[in-house]
């Protein structure tokens, strides 16, 4: 359930994408029927059915893939055999983490999109769950704390596009290598191998940003967010923070932990405006959205 700090109203939790059906079997001409389709995957159809007999006709084709705009700018929904959240691929022809891609012809030009899996991305989970806004859109400048290997960073880069920039900070050198490799082709990503607790060490690399997102899973993450906002977030800018309850306090109920973290964010000079749980995609996680010096 979501929680709106302004009105007290909640946002309904998002429904997980349904598993798609397997592919149909082939239609026989002289011989027996083709094999049944495989089971559906997390985001849609499984393997197609087996072919018909020697002279068998092909099975019917699935529904045409259609891309429609999501209410959040720069985010899209793929409608076809299954429904999925997608972003427009900044570097067509290549996946980042073996995610599914699809091409759609738009105004005589083929545009490639990538599936944005809410089980692999907390921002995607928040979008599917009904968050009011993420304030990340084409042209945005984003500071991403806890970039890991770049799974979600790559989708944020898709959204902000060539006129935006994503400064991605990651402490782990192992994950950082993957992040750096991803950024070689996504030129709007600036990878920074550093400690998010020490923003002064990368202040010469990062400009003022529109949004700060943090997914650092540390007990002092509210303080980490506060420091980075003071250094880099524009007045009137926005922040998003993913809170993993057990990383803060494993002895308390998640709701109690979330409430305490919201209070800490307020003490850092931030203004929390909405809280959203990330079930069923992430257990005991919440996303908090807010503004800074608005």
UniProtKB/Swiss-Prot annotation:
<feature type="modified residue" description="Asymmetric dimethylarginine">
    <location>
        <position position="27"/>
    </location>
</feature>
<keyword id="KW-0808">Transferase</keyword>
<dbReference type="GO" id="GO:0008649">
    <property type="term" value="F:rRNA methyltransferase activity"/>
</dbReference>
<dbReference type="InterPro" id="IPR020813">
    <property type="entry name" value="Fibrillarin_CS"/>
</dbReference>
<dbReference type="Pfam" id="PF01269">
    <property type="entry name" value="Fibrillarin"/>
</dbReference>
<keyword id="KW-0687">Ribonucleoprotein</keyword>
<feature type="modified residue" description="Asymmetric dimethylarginine">
    <location>
        <position position="47"/>
    </location>
</feature>
<keyword id="KW-0694">RNA-binding</keyword>
<comment type="function">
    <text>S-adenosyl-L-methionine-dependent methyltransferase that has the ability to methylate both RNAs and proteins. Involved in pre-rRNA processing. Utilizes the methyl donor S-adenosyl-L-methionine to catalyze the site-specific 2'-hydroxyl methylation of ribose moieties in pre-ribosomal RNA. Site specificity is provided by a guide RNA that base pairs with the substrate. Methylation occurs at a characteristic distance from the sequence involved in base pairing with the guide RNA.</text>
</comment>
<keyword id="KW-0698">rRNA processing</keyword>
<dbReference type="GO" id="GO:0032040">
    <property type="term" value="C:small-subunit processome"/>
</dbReference>
<keyword id="KW-0949">S-adenosyl-L-methionine</keyword>
<dbReference type="GO" id="GO:0000494">
    <property type="term" value="P:box C/D sno(s)RNA 3'-end processing"/>
</dbReference>
<comment type="similarity">
    <text>Belongs to the methyltransferase superfamily. Fibrillarin family.</text>
</comment>
<dbReference type="GO" id="GO:1990259">
    <property type="term" value="F:histone H2AQ104 methyltransferase activity"/>
</dbReference>
<feature type="binding site">
    <location>
        <begin position="215"/>
        <end position="218"/>
    </location>
    <ligand>
        <name>S-adenosyl-L-methionine</name>
    </ligand>
</feature>
<dbReference type="GO" id="GO:0031428">
    <property type="term" value="C:box C/D methylation guide snoRNP complex"/>
</dbReference>
<protein>
    <recommendedName>
        <fullName>rRNA 2'-O-methyltransferase fibrillarin</fullName>
        <ecNumber>2.1.1.-</ecNumber>
    </recommendedName>
</protein>
<comment type="subunit">
    <text>Component of box C/D small nucleolar ribonucleoprotein (snoRNP) particles. It is associated with the U3, U8 and U13 small nuclear RNAs.</text>
</comment>
<feature type="binding site">
    <location>
        <begin position="170"/>
        <end position="171"/>
    </location>
    <ligand>
        <name>S-adenosyl-L-methionine</name>
    </ligand>
</feature>
<dbReference type="GO" id="GO:0005730">
    <property type="term" value="C:nucleolus"/>
</dbReference>
<feature type="modified residue" description="Asymmetric dimethylarginine">
    <location>
        <position position="61"/>
    </location>
</feature>
<feature type="compositionally biased region" description="Gly residues">
    <location>
        <begin position="20"/>
        <end position="56"/>
    </location>
</feature>
<keyword id="KW-0488">Methylation</keyword>
<feature type="binding site">
    <location>
        <begin position="195"/>
        <end position="196"/>
    </location>
    <ligand>
        <name>S-adenosyl-L-methionine</name>
    </ligand>
</feature>
<dbReference type="InterPro" id="IPR029063">
    <property type="entry name" value="SAM-dependent_MTases_sf"/>
</dbReference>
<feature type="binding site">
    <location>
        <begin position="151"/>
        <end position="152"/>
    </location>
    <ligand>
        <name>S-adenosyl-L-methionine</name>
    </ligand>
</feature>
<keyword id="KW-0489">Methyltransferase</keyword>
<feature type="region of interest" description="Disordered">
    <location>
        <begin position="1"/>
        <end position="62"/>
    </location>
</feature>
<dbReference type="GO" id="GO:0003723">
    <property type="term" value="F:RNA binding"/>
</dbReference>
<dbReference type="InterPro" id="IPR000692">
    <property type="entry name" value="Fibrillarin"/>
</dbReference>
<keyword id="KW-0539">Nucleus</keyword>
């Amino acid at each position: 359930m979501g929680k709106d700090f302004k009105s007290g109203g909640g946002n309904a939790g998002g429904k997980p994408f349904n598993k798609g059906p397997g592919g149909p079997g082939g239609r026989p001409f002289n011989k027996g029927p083709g094999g049944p389709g495989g089971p559906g995957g997390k985001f849609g159809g499984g393997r197609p059915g087996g072919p018909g007999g020697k002279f068998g006709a092909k099975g019917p084709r699935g529904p045409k893939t259609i891309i429609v705009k999501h209410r959040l700018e720069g985010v899209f929904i793929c409608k076809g055999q299954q429904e999925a959240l997608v972003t427009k691929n900044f570097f067509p022809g290549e996946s980042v983490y073996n995610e599914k891609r699809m091409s759609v012809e738009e105004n005589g030009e083929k545009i490639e999109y990538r599936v944005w899996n809410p089980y692999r991305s907390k921002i995607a989970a928040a979008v599917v769950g009904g968050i009011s806004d993420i304030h990340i859109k084409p042209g945005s400048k984003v500071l991403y704390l806890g970039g890991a290997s770049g799974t979600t960073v790559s989708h944020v880069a898709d959204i902000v596009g060539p006129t935006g920039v994503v400064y991605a900070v990651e402490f782990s050198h192992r994950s950082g290598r993957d992040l750096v490799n991803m950024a070689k082709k996504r030129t709007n990503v600036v990878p920074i191998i550093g400690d998010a607790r020490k923003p002064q060490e990368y202040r010469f690399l990062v400009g003022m940003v529109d949004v700060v997102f943090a997914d650092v899973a540390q007990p002092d993450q509210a303080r980490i967010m506060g420091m980075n906002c003071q250094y880099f977030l524009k007045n009137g800018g926005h922040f998003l923070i993913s809170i993993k309850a057990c990383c803060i306090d494993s002895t308390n109920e998640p709701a109690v932990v979330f409430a305490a973290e919201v209070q800490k964010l307020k003490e850092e000079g931030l203004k929390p405006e909405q809280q959203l749980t990330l079930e069923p995609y992430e257990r005991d996680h919440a996303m908090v959205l807010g503004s800074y010096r608005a």
